[in-house]
Amino acid sequence: MFANARAKRRSRASSPTPARLGGYAPLRVEITEEQRQDINEAFKLFDSDKDNAIDYHELRAAMRALGFNAEKSEVLKILRDFDKTGKGYLQMEDFVRVMTEKIVERDPLEEIKRAFELFDDDETGKISLRNLRRVAKELNENIDDQELEAMIEEFDLDQDGEINEQEFIAIMMDEA
């Protein structure tokens, strides 16, 4: 799982795809093809009536699906700024612009810390064998305990049998 995450990060970093942003003056920003697909899939998933436009509730749900906990005021501002019809809808191209900008603005360290919290569901501040087992099961990964223990051992710098947040950050930043 950790090795896959590092490999995935490397492949993302090495294969950016340009995206155009901004209201009337497009900016050139780099996102990966996978990120672009995630944005498109989120839009299509939450465009419940398939009219190529999403309303407030659909926009908020799509943003959450992409990992953004948007407040009501932020969602309303996006609709005000990008709704060309004045009917409270966001077109797909504008959704792609907004989400691309938000993805580019993400703080990688905050994203890693959020990922750590997903592993550390018991809030101990560490990723245990039990935590890894649960995540592997949720991801439908068939990894036996011996392999999971080897993963912990490889990255457990303080040799306490678990991965703490700093060790996890080092793994994800490729410093381990």
Swiss-Prot record:
Compartment(s): Nucleus
Subunit architecture: Component of the spindle pole body (SPB), acting as the connector of microtubule arrays in the cytoplasm and the nucleoplasm, is involved in nuclear positioning before chromosome segregation, SPB separation, spindle formation, chromosome segregation, nuclear migration into the bud, nuclear reorientation after cytokinesis and nuclear fusion during conjugation. The SPB half-bridge, which is tightly associated with the cytoplasmic side of the nuclear envelope and the SPB, is playing a key role as the starting structure for and in the initiation of SPB duplication in G1.
Function: Required for the proper coordination between exit from mitosis and the initiation of septation. Has a role in bipolar spindle formation during spindle pole body (SPB) duplication. Required for the localization of sad1 to the SPB.
Name of the molecule in the record: Cell division control protein 31
Keywords from the named record: Calcium, Cell cycle, Cell division, Metal-binding, Mitosis, Nucleus, Repeat
GO cellular component, one term: half bridge of mitotic spindle pole body
Compositionally biased spans, kind Basic residues: 1-12
GO BP terms, alphabetized: cell division; meiotic spindle pole body organization; microtubule cytoskeleton organization; mitotic spindle pole body duplication; proteasome-mediated ubiquitin-dependent protein catabolic process; spindle pole body duplication
SUPFAM superfamilies recorded: EF-hand
Organism: Schizosaccharomyces pombe (strain 972 / ATCC 24843)
Superkingdom of origin organism: Eukaryota
Family membership: Belongs to the centrin family.
Residues that bind Ca(2+) 1: 47, 49, 51, 58
